[in-house]
């Protein structure tokens, strides 16, 4: 494939946009550099770039797209609402309707508030938990990404009883000292951290199924034990379901796993491709948010009618029978084919799959926690990424990310993808 126009536009972009991208994950730095492909439009499972190349898309905007690009039902809903106005600054019927549909799908959301991003949603749940418990410290799990607010850009200390350090310039040490980071799926480390800091902890922040170092499921009993220990110390459990809500079934991962938090942050999929975030949970906790309580959260664009209408339309598509069963079937077809090719070419790799989402890791370890992904073969992934891109398969340019299937992918797309993998693996020996 030729990417002449993408390369030209990237040079132009560098003149005006810092680093040439509006989010660092869009650069190709993690896969050896080069100009990222500039896309012009998307339809269904496909993206089309400025050079006229067509791609089967498994990036799907890092997770928000589950019904394919430019889904006609969602597109029409957005167009109809845009004709009526995109922002009023007042309450609307749409936000009531959307909240009702969300609570019907995720019963733990006794009360709901909308914001504009997953970062805002997580940031606010932390503030609410602190207001409710009158404590300051937070526990998070290594490798889980919870947005770019100061409190969650914190690296692990040298052990479970050690406080964190800033994971980004501009995050004060004083902020990092309010955060403890422990390994996911390691209940003993969590026990140790709570034993040391539990009386000061406001909440633990958990991805119930991890989506930010690939797709990683909790070990049996892990989430249940986290809930038990957390509540024993009077702290709250916050689930970050920004990636997982409506990804695996019509509802949240908590319902699938039958383990429930006190508060939930959500976003991505529920906006139908438009900017959105939200949070909700137990009524007695949520009542600490203004205007009923002292914890402040506001937003000019929060609950805007365009995002609300898109979200309603998205749920109308997903609530149809058979949607998630088909995603699971496609995911299994892709996984089975990848495993067969790994064996055929003697590639050192493993796969984690959760329904219609999976990650291919270049390691022989079964992935259960972040350090294993950190130590996986990044050079092999970078080579694989470029080989796939040049065959028209669009993946995330990072060994930490998942492949996302949509309602618009077909068996033929999977088969074409596997042909590309077959060739890529043949060039990696």
Swiss-Prot record:
PTM N6-(pyridoxal phosphate)lysine: list the residues.
Answer: 268
Top-level division of the source organism's lineage: Bacteria
Q: Does the keyword Iron-sulfur apply?
A: no
Which species is the source of this protein? Answer: Staphylococcus haemolyticus (strain JCSC1435)
Pathway it acts in? Porphyrin-containing compound metabolism; protoporphyrin-IX biosynthesis; 5-aminolevulinate from L-glutamyl-tRNA(Glu): step 2/2
Q: How does it assemble?
A: Homodimer.
Q: Which GO terms describe its biological process?
A: protoporphyrinogen IX biosynthetic process
Gene3D superfamilies per record: Aspartate Aminotransferase, domain 1, Type I PLP-dependent aspartate aminotransferase-like (Major domain)
Source taxonomy lineage? Bacteria, Bacillati, Bacillota, Bacilli, Bacillales
- Give the UniProt subcellular location, in the record's own words: Cytoplasm
User: What is catalysed by this protein?
Assistant: (S)-4-amino-5-oxopentanoate = 5-aminolevulinate
Q: Name one GO cellular component term.
A: cytoplasm
Q: Where is it mostly found?
A: cytoplasm
Its name, as the record gives it, is: Glutamate-1-semialdehyde 2,1-aminomutase 1
Q: Which cofactor does it need?
A: pyridoxal 5'-phosphate
GO MF terms held by the record:
glutamate-1-semialdehyde 2,1-aminomutase activity; pyridoxal phosphate binding; transaminase activity
Name the family. Answer: Belongs to the class-III pyridoxal-phosphate-dependent aminotransferase family. HemL subfamily.
Q: Which HAMAP family match?
A: HemL_aminotrans_3 (MF_00375)
What does the record give as EC number? 5.4.3.8
**Does Calcium count among this protein's keywords?**
no
Keyword line: Cytoplasm, Isomerase, Porphyrin biosynthesis, Pyridoxal phosphate
Coiled-coil residue spans: none
